Amino acid sequence: MKAENCCIVIFGASGDLTYRKLIPALYNLYKIDRLGEDFSVLGVARTELNDKSFREKMRQTLIKNEGAKGECLEQFCSHLYYQAVNTADKADYAKLVPRLDELHDTYRTEGNTLYYLSTPPSLYGVIPECLGEHGLNKEDRGWKRLIVEKPFGYDRETAEALDIQIHRFFEEHQIYRIDHYLGKETVQNLLVLRFSNGWFEPLWNRNFIDYIEITGAESIGVEERGGYYDGSGAMRDMFQNHLLQVLAMVAMEPPVIINANSMRDEVAKVLHCLRPLTQEDVEHNLVLGQYVAGEVDGEWVKGYLEEKGVPPYSTTETYMALRCEIENWRWAGVPFYVRTGKRLPARVTEIVIHFKTTPHPVFSQNAPENKLIIRIQPDEGISMRFGLKKPGAGFEAKEVSMDFRYADLAGATVMTAYERLLLDAMKGDATLFARTDAVHAAWKFVQPILNYKAQGGRLYDYEAGTWGPTAADKLIAKSGRVWRRPSGLMKKKV
């Protein structure tokens, strides 16, 4: 299904996200004919560029990063325009009014406008207000939609204040809070796996599942983002948004119908059902860590405190592990172990469903565990692990697997997260975007962790290239469980 005809306005068009993700995503949608010809892209930033220079910059980016060439590239670039605007100056937004009118008339886009805030978070409230002051939020001529990047607030209080500020000019149905994790194919397939297969849904509860672990690991450090990262840390950067949303999709009830409101209702219910964290929880079920120098992929790397832009006495966490529970009928008593960190041995995001063992071990006390591994990135796919008889005498069981990889689908075109989410926003499908009640529930849940950090909670060192502090292993071992050590999901076909 194609996107609706519209003008896409990218605020922060001279920034890294526009070059790396947004323009390549729009180009690829154009290449597979999901945009058609009746669209335009207006880049907006303070940098003094014109249409020609902006097109050339984007053209070189697409050649370098996407291997773009030929007529398709030139035609796409002809849809790109630029307007220099001081985004902090309300009066300067007057320049956008005639420019957008001209583009809507040229491309017959009927006033439909998608605003993308690829800017520092300090402008998330300013830009909607400035658009509203010039009437660029009104839907009297076509729809107006606003995509807001993370972080949506710094804590519960600032998130609620930002909502109030944006809602003065844009209604909730116009606001699309983007989380690129939810645009990944495997996350979406999790819902199909659960709700369309009779194998899984009857087992997806406390009666059959022992525990669930969710891992969001990165092998890189903070790179050139030391100053930004030090103000957020692993909890704000990954856990509060990405991983809590993934947890909610693992645990949610079946929606009544597949539409944005029903899906997001169920996500919000899960977040509201998370057992509130007590002081005892944050002291005994939470591990915060910070990497020190070590070896990653055979290369010696510096510690966090040595990174550019990081204060020498920073107590910002680069690792977090938490045991949490959901207080409802389906999940009562099932622990969810969630961890994320930088400078770990591999870049991998996965969900592991650990099923309970048989009531009585007929063949062996050490029979292989039944588990379902859902790999979100990289090497997206699903693997079922279970026990079968080892060839030879006796009845010794060994672990075997049944594996599926998206890369093995002949002719499959798997959209990137930004391609999928941009297309959905242009179609008016908010299913994979966070709603305000879910955002507030997530911030409410993590507030005790923020308080613990502010009070100087314990921070463990871990060597770069390891799977985090040994305290995280002890956390899960207290209940006789272990973290999976992610490696290749499965062997690739040759």
UniProtKB/Swiss-Prot annotation:
GO MF assignments: glucose-6-phosphate dehydrogenase activity; NADP binding
PANTHER family: GLUCOSE-6-PHOSPHATE 1-DEHYDROGENASE (PTHR23429:SF0), GLUCOSE-6-PHOSPHATE 1-DEHYDROGENASE G6PD (PTHR23429)
GO biological process entries: glucose metabolic process; pentose-phosphate shunt, oxidative branch
Entry-linked Pfam families: G6PD_C (PF02781), G6PD_N (PF00479)
Organism: Aggregatibacter actinomycetemcomitans (Actinobacillus actinomycetemcomitans)
Keywords attached to this entry: Carbohydrate metabolism, Glucose metabolism, NADP, Oxidoreductase
Organism lineage: Bacteria, Pseudomonadati, Pseudomonadota, Gammaproteobacteria, Pasteurellales
Gene3D superfamilies in the record: Dihydrodipicolinate Reductase, domain 2 (3.30.360.10), NAD(P)-binding Rossmann-like Domain (3.40.50.720)
Pathway entry: Carbohydrate degradation; pentose phosphate pathway; D-ribulose 5-phosphate from D-glucose 6-phosphate (oxidative stage): step 1/3
Active-site residues from the entry: 242 (proton acceptor)
Protein name as it appears in the record: Glucose-6-phosphate 1-dehydrogenase
EC category: oxidoreductase
InterPro entries the record matches: G6P_DH (IPR001282), G6P_DH_AS (IPR019796), G6P_DH_C (IPR022675), G6P_DH_NAD-bd (IPR022674), NAD(P)-bd_dom_sf (IPR036291)
Positions with a binding annotation for substrate: 180, 184, 218, 237, 342
Similarity remark: Belongs to the glucose-6-phosphate dehydrogenase family.
Coiled-coil parts of chain: none
Function noted in UniProt: Catalyzes the oxidation of glucose 6-phosphate to 6-phosphogluconolactone.
Source taxon at top rank: Bacteria
EC nos: 1.1.1.49
Catalytic activity: D-glucose 6-phosphate + NADP(+) = 6-phospho-D-glucono-1,5-lactone + NADPH + H(+)
